[in-house]
Swiss-Prot record:
InterPro entries in the record: Beta-lactam/transpept-like, Glutaminase
Record protein name field: Glutaminase
Domain of life: Bacteria
Any GO BP annotation: glutamine catabolic process
SUPFAM superfamilies: beta-lactamase/transpeptidase-like
Length: 304
């Protein structure tokens, strides 16, 4: 199968979907991103790379960082982590307070904002500077020593992060955050503000397709069981309240971010990253979903 020709053809098929979504505007620094961009990149376990479009343009990975933070923290915390955060889909918006109150400060899963704040808090307990640890890992996996958080986006998120602050204070009141709220928020916002390209993101995510083992560095980041767990939570919770649609149309573990990125995993084969900044009503990339749908439909590569 000629994957390069396939993704180039898919790119042409999805470009007409421009303007069927809108760029995230609740974070002002994201609102200024030019909307008509699309990139896709594939990294396979046997070392092949395919990319087209704007695959080398860095973008804010936003909530995709939560998948990497979950992996880092699960490696350090083990099963203890699941006493502080659940594994179930929420069915609510990613920044909802309602469910958190009903469930006494235990977030439903690690990928809604409340859950990611708890994971960050647990990571701080193990690494001190969890953001620095995440950056070091991503730099090693991508080979980009200059990979950084976008400070303008981090500052913009902090200035407009009252809902996240409310979530953190609420969980703190239930004893489910062990560190100062400001410390947790600062590291969380900086994680979300990391800028990566599709090529880099697919390369960094490849360990999830390889039972937790990085093909690039030979590092075993997760046990086989833990890699299965992360992929499972990505499948059921990784695209917020659109997880059912993604499972139906794409059939892969996927993590999305409001920067317009998507990271998809085909266990035993490859990782795929797609990016286009215009989002649907649920906060997922319009063109990214269309591209992944076409890719799995035409290749037959899904977990189902």
């Amino acid at each position: 199968m000629n994957l390069q020709a396939l993704i180039e053809d898919i790119r042409q098929q999805v470009l007409p979907f421009y303007d069927q979504g809108r760029v995230a505007d609740y974070i002002p620094a994201l609102a200024s991103v030019p909307p008509h961009q699309f990139g896709i990149a594939i990294h396979t376990l046997d070392g092949r790379e395919h990319a087209c479009g704007d695959a080398d343009t860095p973008f804010s990975i936003q909530s995709i960082s939560k998948a990497f933070m979950l992996a880092l923290t699960l490696q350090a915390d083990g099963e203890q982590l699941w006493r502080h955060v659940g594994k179930e889909p929420s069915g609510n918006p990613f920044n909802s307070l309602v469910q958190l109150e009903y469930e006494h400060g235990i977030p439903r899963n690690p990928f809604i904002n409340a859950g990611a704040l708890v994971v960050t808090d647990r990571a701080i307990g193990h690494f001190g500077d969890a953001h620095a640890r995440l950056l070091a890992w991503l730099r090693e996996e991508t080979g980009n020593a200059g990979l950084m958080a976008d400070q303008a986006i981090a500052a913009s998120e902090r200035a407009h992060g009252d809902r996240n602050a409310a979530l953190a204070h609420f969980m703190k009141s239930y004893g489910n955050l062990g560190h100062p709220v400001e410390t947790v928020l600062d590291q969380y916002f900086h994680n979300c503000s990391i800028a990566m390209s599709c090529r880099e993101l697919a390369r960094a995510g490849l360990f999830l397709a390889n039972h937790g083992l990085s093909p690039q560095t030979g590092t075993q980041y997760l046990s086989r069981s833990q890699a299965k767990q992360v992929n499972a939570v990505m499948l059921t919770c990784g695209t917020y309240d659109a997880a059912g649609e993604f499972a139906y149309r794409v059939g892969l573990p996927v993590k999305s971010g409001v920067g317009g990125g998507l990271l998809a995993v085909i266990p035993g084969k490859m990782a795929i990253a797609a990016w286009s900044p215009q989002l649907d009503a649920r906060g997922n990339s319009v063109l990214g979903l269309e591209a992944l749908d076409r890719f799995t439909t035409r290749t037959g590569l899904s977990i189902f």
